[in-house]
Amino acid sequence: MIKILDSKNKNFDKTLDALLSKRKNKVQLNSVSVIKIIKDVKKNGDKAILKYEKRFNKNSIIAPSIKQINRAIQSLDQKVKKAIDLAYDRIYKFHSLQKFKNISYTDKLKNKLEYKYVPIESVAIYVPGSTASYPSSVLMNAVPAIVAGVKRLVMVNPGQKGKQNPAVLYAAKKCKIKEIYSIGGPSAIAAVAYGTKKIKKVDKIIGPGNSYVAAAKKEVFGDVGIEGMIAGPSEVTIVCDKFSNPEWIASDLIGQAEHDNLAQCILISKDKSIIKKVNYEIINQLKELPRAVIAKNSLLNNGILIYMPSDQKIINTVNKIAPEHLELNTKNYKKVVSKIKNAGSICLGKYAVMAMTDYNVGSNHVLPTNSSARYSSGVSVNEFYKRISYINLSKKGIETLGPSVITLANYEGLVGHAKSVEKRIRRK
């Protein structure tokens, strides 16, 4: 069922590149239809949003009432509430350690330079909800924003026939989110990016979503901020060895595959027998999975089991894939981990299962996908800050440094720049 590759094959690199590119192309194919939706929402506002909500989500409600929200929350099991509370506390604790220090510096000329972190004023959090509900995504996006000091938090989350998941609503209440909209997809992204009569636009949009949502965020970027990476369909790469438990490894792969039909699950091992055992376990475990159809499609289309006898080749391949999630489920992971440069998050050892990081370990699960871990990072408190430089020059400072600036400005042909300095240091 799952594609099995041997790195010793002379066409291995080409085959792997083709498989990875094929999935990337699927993720990127949605841009044309997304642009049409965004233009429609910009032109027709709430009317366009309702049109797409009725078509895709069978929903005719843009914003649930406070009464509807409270009624839904009251129906939530206490165990789930406590689990959300625990996750909130742990995520808050870890992210509160990510505080950033303002810088203030005065030089010998009494010029004062400052660099300050200023919270973004308004942020919209996109929480997926078309095939499953994710209260954890509310926490992962909202808690760092709370730590940063964002004043206005907005949540967009596609409801099912206008009804949102009680756990998602409880998590939003826990995070003191007062603006909640039961909309999703590209139209929701356009709504918070450009605003409508019912929805006030925001300064930044963050949060994971399917390929359509990811494409929409890329399209609105520039008119509104987005996170420093695109959080698209989920990915995991697992490196295991003969000491790994094949039952555990299979369940980790399936756990990622059940997210989305475009989820990417890759296994790499130096041991052929573990690959066979994991493959067998996957077939058996899928029979017990409620979301087996999604997981099976994902594994069939984007799953890869790779035999790779060289440690260096494994390291190079992982850095090339640059996965969202990486599990180093090997005995020698300490020797390997320092050489891994491209991954959204790295789970070390047999107990650090990716599913734990999705919920209450404390680290963030909104991570770069589609190989963007080569140049970007997951959501952190830093995502919700702007950095502003403050400059206060003394008379002595401009008189001392100004002549050099005039020289450079004239050299670059920017005479106006040079003259604006000259006028301040000209002797009368």
Curated annotation (Swiss-Prot):
Its EC number is 1.1.1.23. Binds 1 zinc ion per subunit. One of its GO terms (biological process) is L-histidine biosynthetic process. GO terms for cellular component: cytosol. The keyword NAD applies. The keyword Manganese does not apply. Zn(2+) binds at Q256, H259, D358, H417. Keywords: Amino-acid biosynthesis, Histidine biosynthesis, Metal-binding, NAD, Oxidoreductase, Zinc. It catalyses: L-histidinol + 2 NAD(+) + H2O = L-histidine + 2 NADH + 3 H(+). Its cofactor is Zn(2+). Catalyzes the sequential NAD-dependent oxidations of L-histidinol to L-histidinaldehyde and then to L-histidine. Belongs to the histidinol dehydrogenase family. HAMAP family: HisD. This is Histidinol dehydrogenase. The gene is hisD.
